[in-house]
Amino acid sequence: MPAAATGGALLIPPFAEERKGVLPVYVQTARSLADAGIAALLFDFYGCGDSDGDFASTDPAAFEIECSAALEWLAATLPGLPLFVNGARAGALLAARLAAARGDVAAAVLWSPVSGADFARQLLQRHMVNDMVAYGKARESRSALEARLRQGQTVDLDGYPVSGAFYAWLQELRPLPLAAPALVFSGGHDAKTAEAFCGGGHATLPDLRYPPFWNTVGHVDTRGLAAATVAWLRALPHGRAVAPCLPTALPASTQTAELASFGDPEEPISVIWDLADGPVRGGALFLHGWSGDRTGPHRMFTRFARLLARNGFLCLRPDFIGRGLSGGGSGDASIALMTENAQTALDALRRRLPTGSPIAVVGICSGCKVALTLAARNPEIARLLLWSPESMGSLRSPATGLRKTFAALKNYARKLLRPETWRKLAAGKVQTGMVAKALVKQEKRSAAEAIREDAALKLFRGFRNPVCFVFGGSDPDAPGSRAAYARYCHAHGIPHETHLIAHAGHSYYSERWTRELFEASMAFLT
């Protein structure tokens, strides 16, 4: 929010895991818009991200109502100023619908729009690929899954319970000509859908290519997309600069959660407090992975923190610097900085808890390295819960990277057996650079990082509170990490237990796997 705004932009996210990939780009764009005098509002749909509710219970018809309500709030906060909408992927189609339905949208920016039917098809394809990795074959064909959805059944698509109603709604989500000025980016991915917005003669399609950041592990350079978006919106006619009507701002807390920030005001750590229901029995600090945010993969952190809160835990979920809604850029992130952020968060949790309350730390993926280092420095941490921990320091064998590369090769080999893969290769629709990165850049660490990890392991030898390791059966790193941590804990007398969730991947992309993970985790923590 700029001190004096000349316009306002509503940023409409995509669905499912694409929301996680788009979030860093939206945060970067929102900050650039604010620097240009344009206020930006980013929200989560009901049942998504940090919002209330479960995805399974969402009413798809409400998505457009939520978009309209968010725009109404922006209009009330910035009376008389022009309003813009920016949507990504399926969110781009919602942005276009919003612009068509309301007369107060001055312009629209659409990033890589995808029709609802194509998005549904991609969800199903991704589910089948993950099924093949987990079970060696797809247990259901796409046509069988589609038939179940058309019958109104709910299908678990990689941790998201997709209802028949949501699937039917997606089939009707199509591009439409725009009457308002529009900037439509295909990025080199789906030019046909992008061109479908040009029927009204008001759309511009710039030739800007970028990787599929909504579906990419890790962080990619999207500065060109953000800069082009801001430059185009900035060049449009704006209103006279006014100070936002902050009294109409949304509250920073609800009955069950609080949004807050602490640390350096220039680079604040953005956090969510999930408030305990009833007397506080303890606290829980959640530490996300390298490319994630405080919601966790398919909202696992959001959901598990709320489960703990209902059982009397005060939970704190921070975004590390350079991630999520915290300050800094993606290039600022490092394991060392993540550990500093975690210490700041732990201190804040201690101050808020009743004296002597036990604190548990929950980490996933790279967040487990941070959790272990934090516990080594704070041995009073009562319990350490590590989901899919990577091997650290000298515990990591040279075979770790080879196992992951081999698993990736098997995955791509399966894809090469499909006719549609060759059609995409011929059409230039496969990001070969991203494939190469996945195959040859597996988990490389600097010598300095390895030394820091060994120093943390040396200090952690004295930790004497319970540790729980949880691994997925199809995670290629699980066998080595599981054995290495078991040897380490046995050698140094650290009380520990290990759970293996059969067939699960690194991020437990299944409602059944997630349920089993939560049950084991609750048994350990309570």
In which residue ranges do the predicted regions lie?
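N-terminal cap/lid segment of alpha/beta-hydrolase-fold proteins
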Residues: 1-7, 231-282, 510
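Short, surface-exposed "cap/lid" segments of acyl-processing enzymes
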Residues: 2-44, 277-320
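Alpha/beta-hydrolase active-site loop signature
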Residues: 16, 45-50, 115, 291, ...
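Catalytic nucleophile-loop/oxyanion-hole region of alpha/beta-hydrolase
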Residues: 49-80, 323-355
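Short beta-strand immediately N-terminal to the catalytic nucleophile in serine-hydrolase-like folds
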Residues: 84-87, 111, 361-363, 387
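Gly/Ala-rich beta-loop-alpha elbow adjacent to hydrolase catalytic centers
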Residues: 86-95, 362-371
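Active-site signature of alpha/beta-hydrolase-fold catalytic machinery across serine-
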Residues: 97-101, 373-377
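The alpha/beta-hydrolase serine catalytic core
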Residues: 104-230, 380-518, 524
